[in-house]
Amino acid sequence: MARIAGVNIPNHQHAVIALTAIYGIGRTTSGKICEAAGIAQTSKIKDLSEAEMERLREGVSKFTVEGDLRREVTMNIKRLMDLGCYRGFRHRKGLPVRGQRTRTNARTRKGPRKAIKK
């Protein structure tokens, strides 16, 4: 298994798919990284030379990924909560943030139903 950005990349997958194992890199970004590195998207990770792997590592290092990205997202949410704005309040209460209805259909965000005590 190859390691890029502290993540073990699966050897048997195509390069464009294998790069999506890194948090913060999806299909579009991985395609751009492969294109910039001059690697065919259909080539498998196990078939790449060490020089090609190094070009992939350089391409990935230009993006904010893994721990840094997780920390950045967490800090953005914390900042909203500290500001006391509407979005921060919704995060704090564990409710949908982007205007969805909550009378019904908010179970994912609200969690399991709580029984009403009589």
UniProtKB/Swiss-Prot annotation:
Belongs to the universal ribosomal protein uS13 family. The gene is rpsM. The lineage of its organism: Bacteria, Pseudomonadati, Pseudomonadota, Betaproteobacteria, Nitrosomonadales. Keywords: Ribonucleoprotein, Ribosomal protein, RNA-binding, rRNA-binding, tRNA-binding. PROSITE patterns: RIBOSOMAL_S13_1, RIBOSOMAL_S13_2. This is Small ribosomal subunit protein uS13. The keyword Protein biosynthesis does not apply. Located at the top of the head of the 30S subunit, it contacts several helices of the 16S rRNA. In the 70S ribosome it contacts the 23S rRNA (bridge B1a) and protein L5 of the 50S subunit (bridge B1b), connecting the 2 subunits; these bridges are implicated in subunit movement. Contacts the tRNAs in the A and P-sites. Residues 94-118 are annotated as: Disordered. GO terms for biological process: translation. GO terms for molecular function: rRNA binding; structural constituent of ribosome; tRNA binding. Part of the 30S ribosomal subunit. Forms a loose heterodimer with protein S19. Forms two bridges to the 50S subunit in the 70S ribosome. InterPro entries: Rbsml_uS13_C, Ribosomal_uS13, Ribosomal_uS13-like_H2TH, Ribosomal_uS13_bac-type, Ribosomal_uS13_CS. GO terms for cellular component: cytosol; small ribosomal subunit.
